[in-house]
Amino acid sequence: MGSFKVIIVGGGPAGLVAAHALHQAGIDFVVLERRGSVVDPSGASVVLNPPAMRILSQFGLREQLEDAGAELNHVKSFTNAGYNLGAAQVIYHRPELVRIMYEGLPSDARGKVLTDKKVTTIHQNPDSDTVTVSCSDGSTYTGSIAIGADGAHSRTRQQLRQAMIRDGQPLSICDDEKPYECAYRMLWCSFPRPDSIPPGLGGETQGVDRTLALMVGKASAMIICYEKLSEPTRERVEYSDKDMAQMFESFADWPVTETLRFRDVFDSRTAGMANLHEGIVKNFSKGRVCLVSDSCHRYTPNAGLGLNNGIQDVVALCNEIQAAVEQAGPESEPSQEGITKAFESYLNQRLKLMKKDLRGSALLTRLQAWASTLHYIMARYLLVPDWVQRLTINYVAVPTMRQAPVFKYIAAEEPYVGTTAWVHPIKPRTIT
């Protein structure tokens, strides 16, 4: 496949999925992670949906993932006064998920995941059809394309925007410097799972403009408190310990289960606080640089759609990259035209669902926080009956999930077979 090489900016879950995918395709890569360690012990919990589990199973990680995760099999809903609503959802401690994904890479591929690499500039070299990424430690990396998987405050996205401005593109076409709006903020903390709380339990405690959510894994649990801001903002906010303490006190007596309040389990040592970003960028690529996951779209976490969408981004993009490289042949590389076509095809596959899930996440956040009288009535009464939830699952969630793509070039056993068939079957292994 010639000397085609991909530079992945960001070593989080989406970046590691890209590393696995490119390794499986036989395409050279390097991952540049700004933190000192790939596995950050302070990470929050995440929920993987069946399409995401199916994709990670293509990497041979199914057994490790099933051992570490807890299926979300029981969900309870409360009001902040403690009344049981009864409602339904599936859990991972993020550091454990990242560890499994990182250690699941072969040793030679793990050696390409570099830490303490804070990206400063990304320069596209039109004369040589390459892109050069520079880091704050003075190191530089040159590749055929760069993939930005570096989060909500993406340096890759900033560099893409600056390149468009340098090329004379009007600001109305360019993304805002801060493209995501924040209407809510969150306080989260993780803690060892108490014996009184079974693995796989999820819960939500609803109030006016506020929600408390519980996710319980096998060894640890996570609580996230959501609160509406006094007014929306696009500014990045760094919250202090005092801010966290004040928000904690305002939620301290909210019920987590029938017998536990938030103050019973809160641990400030494993807590964090941040604004919740929402939005989708206008520009996903330019030249030889392309964005995936949080660098190009952000959802509130209530519906658990952020990482799951990021994984789908990587699947669609890497399928196109692999096809372009294969078409170019072993002695050549894809032309700029071929790269552009691959990036455009990726976006065409993903944009409609991105927008749909953005709307769905925003709606769920506002339902759970009783953002209006209508949201309150829907959350407390109209959406509570089991038959309504079954209809939502069977006629909204399942038809969407069954259409999720997989890596076309990775052969594996189909891990999930049910009454509803997947639209895109996994390539079967060839028996020799």
From Swiss-Prot:
Domain of life: Eukaryota
TM stretches of this protein: none
Alphabetical UniProt keywords: Antibiotic biosynthesis, FAD, Flavoprotein, Glycoprotein, Oxidoreductase, Signal
Annotated protein name in UniProt: FAD-dependent monooxygenase sdnN
UniProt cofactor(s): FAD
SUPFAM superfamilies per the UniProt record, alphabetical: FAD/NAD(P)-binding domain
The organism of origin for this protein: Sordaria araneosa
Family per record: Belongs to the paxM FAD-dependent monooxygenase family.
